[in-house]
């Protein structure tokens, strides 16, 4: 199946640190605009639990703590996008690209992004939100030390990506310090113009 038809879709990369609220904003965008939300993490987990050949290979890679090859991630994104191409009004690609090369490969194999939404919350805010989430989520990676490490990794990886797309003029930065609705108002002001 050709990726040709994906070129006419709106494709939005959503980038934001852990605790920035990007998951919540993605849900609201899906609800209001009829976009399809694709998270690379969810796709990988679904593939593993499907028990497919690809899933078994992925499980072995992830159990070793290694990074899943870029080609595999792109194939999964492309398959998921093509499966929804006829019914979706657009795509939110969540947690991708994590580096400039991933963005370039995405364009080569799939299509160029329409926008990059940068859900930007300050470090303090993200730490606070994650600690609060940790009280109820039971997620082992929601303790302060791990959180600070995750944020460091996130900033290191994301800054060049943001700079790359700023150079193209497609970054829309959201001040994610406000309430969910305040942040969503900013989102709408950008998406309504597309």
Swiss-Prot record:
PROSITE patterns: ADENYLATE_KINASE. Belongs to the adenylate kinase family. AK1 subfamily. It is found in: Cytoplasm. Changing residue 28 to M: No loss in activity. Consists of three domains, a large central CORE domain and two small peripheral domains, NMPbind and LID, which undergo movements during catalysis. The LID domain closes over the site of phosphoryl transfer upon ATP binding. Assembling and dissambling the active center during each catalytic cycle provides an effective means to prevent ATP hydrolysis. Optimum pH is 9.0 for ThTP synthesis. It comes from the Eukaryota. One of its GO terms (biological process) is nucleoside triphosphate biosynthetic process. ATP binds at residues 19-24, 133, 178. GO terms for molecular function: adenylate kinase activity; ATP binding; deoxyadenylate kinase activity; magnesium ion binding; nucleoside diphosphate kinase activity. Thermostable. Its EC number is 2.7.4.3, 2.7.4.4, 2.7.4.6. PANTHER family: NUCLEOTIDE KINASE (PTHR23359). This is Adenylate kinase isoenzyme 1. InterPro entries: Adenylat/UMP-CMP_kin, Adenylat_kinase_CS, AK1, AK1/5, P-loop_NTPase. GO terms for cellular component: cytoplasm; cytosol.
């Amino acid at each position: 199946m050709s990726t040709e038809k994906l070129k006419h879709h709106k494709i939005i990369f959503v980038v934001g640190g852990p605790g920035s609220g990007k998951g919540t904003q993605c849900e609201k965008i899906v609800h209001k605009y009829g976009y399809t939300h694709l998270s690379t993490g969810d796709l990988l987990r679904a593939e593993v639990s499907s028990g497919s050949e690809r899933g078994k290979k992925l499980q072995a890679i992830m159990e070793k703590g290694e990074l899943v090859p870029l080609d595999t991630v792109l194939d999964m994104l492309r398959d998921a996008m093509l499966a929804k191409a006829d019914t979706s009004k657009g795509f939110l690609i969540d947690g991708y690209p994590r580096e400039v090369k991933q963005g370039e490969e995405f364009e080569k194999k799939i299509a160029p992004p329409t926008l990059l939404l940068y859900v930007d919350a300050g470090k303090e805010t993200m730490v606070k939100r994650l600690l609060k989430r940790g009280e109820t989520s039971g997620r082992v990676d929601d303790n302060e030390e791990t959180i600070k490490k995750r944020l460091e990794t996130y900033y290191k990886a994301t800054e060049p990506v943001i700079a790359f797309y700023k150079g193209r003029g497609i970054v829309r930065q959201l001040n994610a310090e406000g309430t969910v609705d305040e942040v969503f108002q900013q989102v709408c002001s950008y998406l309504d113009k597309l």
